[in-house]
Every structure is written in structure tokens, then in C-alpha cells.
Amino acid sequence: PAIAGQGKYCGIHPSDERCRQAVERRLRADGLPRSLAQVLPHLYGDEEMSAGAWLLAYYVRKHHLRWHALHCWHRGYLDLVRMLKAQGEDILASLELLPTNTLAAHPENRHSEELVRPADGLRIPLGHTAGPDWDAVWAAVREGTIDILGSDHSPHLPACYRPQEPFRSSAGVPGLDWYGHLLLNE
């Protein structure tokens, strides 16, 4: 691909259409609604994201790309990135997290079920179901497997949040206003 010749990093979300279709089939078979609460644990679980990462790793190596490994949340994905870095692959690994993830890892700091935007006091509910493996994540940060800490797309404003339409829900709101201070200080 053209990007390989330019020395740029290629970053692709570690998921594919087969994964999404498998979630759809699972929900139908179990008679469950197509809601974010039902979709996210399956779409962003260790098996799905790690499998997507292995496919990306194959593509990256085949085409001699520099890889920006996004959303390194799960043990299987982290183990893959760690192994490939040890083999000399040029990988920039990032952890895009939410204040909800951070607060879930440190429940002693969680004083509410809402997130408050400091500028105007607007409140939105907390919640994310990706279920990161926090012991593995922070070990990877400390050892240098993860290079970048960033913020994820969420949280969602109530007006943009459509839990019954998970593939049409808004990608979220600007993170700095809502939780930049938490990411930097938590």
C-alpha cells in the first residue's frame, strides 16, 4: 500500500464485519434486543478485539507497515503487541480510555453514577462495558508496551445516546470538556 512508502503509521480499529455479524446472530439466537448494553460486551471483548488485532498484525507485517495499535485494552491484544514489539515490529500502541474505565478501576474515587462537565455542571450517566483487564493494562503502561494514553469517543450526551440503535448512536462528545481533567489527574 501507498502508506508503507511514506513511513506513516496505519491505525485501524481491531474489529471487522464478521465480528459485527456474529454479534447480530448471537443477539437474534438469544432473543436479546439490539441495544448498546447487549452489543458492546460482545463487540469489544477480549476475543473479538484480540482476533481483530491478529488479523491486523498479519496485514501490517505482510505490507511492511508501521502500526498504530488502537484500543489496547485486553490481555490477548496486549500479549500480541508485546510479542511483536519484541520481534522488532514498529508499533505504536495506545490505550483510549474513558473516565468510566478509570473510575471502575479505582472505585474508591467513584462518588457518583454520573459524570459532570465542570464548565456548566451538565451531568451524564457513567457506563462502559468493554471490560478492560486493568491489571494487564497498567502493567503494559509501566513496561512500555503501551506508548500513548488517550481518551475514547464517549461519553454520550443524553440527546445523542440511542441505546436501542447501537450502530447509529453518536460517536460521543469532545473529551477535553468532559474528562480531560480526569485523564490528566486521575
Q: Model features per residue range: what roles?
A:
Residues 101, 132, 181-184:
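Residues in flexible loops and secondary-structure boundaries
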Residues 1-120:
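Metal-coordinating catalytic core of metallo-dependent amide/deamination hydrolases
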Residues 123-129:
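Active-site-proximal loop/helix segment associated with metal-binding centers of metalloenzymes
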Residues 2, 136, 140:
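Short, conserved SAM-binding segment of the class I
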Residues 129-133, 137:
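Phosphate/diphosphate-binding loops
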